[in-house]
UniProtKB/Swiss-Prot annotation:
CDD domains linked to this entry: S-AdoMet_synt (cd18079)
Residue numbers binding ATP: 29, 179-181, 247-250, 258, 264-265, 281, 285, 291
Annotated residues for binding of Mg(2+): 31
Record bears the keyword Repeat: no
Tissue: In mammalian tissues, there are three distinct forms of AdoMet synthases designated as alpha, beta, and gamma. Alpha and beta are expressed only in adult liver, while gamma is widely distributed in extrahepatic tissues. In addition, the gamma form predominantly exists in fetal rat liver and is progressively replaced by the alpha and beta forms during development. In the brain, highly expressed at night in pinealocytes (at protein level).
Family: Belongs to the AdoMet synthase family.
Lineage of the organism: Eukaryota, Metazoa, Chordata, Craniata, Vertebrata
Protein name from the UniProt record: S-adenosylmethionine synthase isoform type-2
Amino acid sequence: MNGQLNGFHEAFIEEGTFLFTSESVGEGHPDKICDQINDAVLDAHLQQDPDAKVACETVAKTGMILLAGEITSRAAIDYQKVVREAIKHIGYDDSSKGFDYKTCNVLVALEQQSPDIAQGVHLDRNEEDIGAGDQGLMFGYATDETEECMPLTIVLAHKLNAKLAELRRNGTLPWLRPDSKTQVTVQYMQDRGAVIPIRVHTIVISVQHDEEVCLDEMRDALKEKLIKAVVPAKYLDEDTIYHLQPSGRFVIGGPQGDAGLTGRKIIVDTYGGWGAHGGGAFSGKDYTKVDRSAAYAARWVAKSLVKGGLCRRVLVQVSYAIGVSHPLSISIFHYGTSQKSERELLEIVKNNFDLRPGVIVRDLDLKKPIYQRTAAYGHFGRDSFPWEVPKKLKY
């Protein structure tokens, strides 16, 4: 594997091509710790009460976790246990790593859901006709550049972080710690509105490590054990640039290095900067919060259109008002990659999908405790989730 290591090299970019970059963060990143704790709490409630109404936020800093939010549920939850188990799973199990699930302080500031919201959204209403939990706009995106119908930039960034966790847990690289960040720049060619990845232009990897390992050993291992295992060789060439541990030292990480907060990695969670984002975070929210459920449904719509051969690339927008069940608007943008007009695609979507929250929850089975798995390595592009299974469209 050739390429430029930790040096600036501006490769010539041919006419008709462009560069695009996406980033991902590992399970031990402080913001991602918060997201995973939120969804661990949500799952704990859904295991006992599938109709629980959960809006949970988390703050993390050295030796401390704060849970805040509004929850109405019949479940009896040991929040101390749920939070500590989530942190243990991530890998912060000793104070030498800067955080320890056994000794951290867990503060709980949870209240009931506002009765004003409850009466406007779901009380005394059939499940199919429950209203949206808030106003907002959500997007779904899909592209035919990968089998997952996800951008290659974010697919590779997530896979690099997931592989780092695997190498840490199986002992291959024992100096690894849970906090990590990756970033991938890909050179693309445009093809009548669709995009085709040509090569990987730049890879950035920063990973928390122990005191003993030397920089050269880390850089060599990241190239040989990580990048070669994850990035297909056809995308790497002598001009690929590598910034591996560019800061030189990353011993202090996780909540000790930076405060963590729910919902600060919404682009990592979705499409890596492609498409669009309505601004709402996912983790810690039950299905009545359309920030989450409608974004999942919009992805389902987008992937179904691409996998159905109706377009090569598509962006779907939906919007809602609090207490209103039907979406206020549905919009389709196909980037010129469809033989059908955007109006025709919109009619196909309306005839095949019911985007009321109470129907989305049924079609995508969103009352099941599946959410902790979504909270790291992206909510989209993994076949184990119902919204990633394309619907066979009738038109």
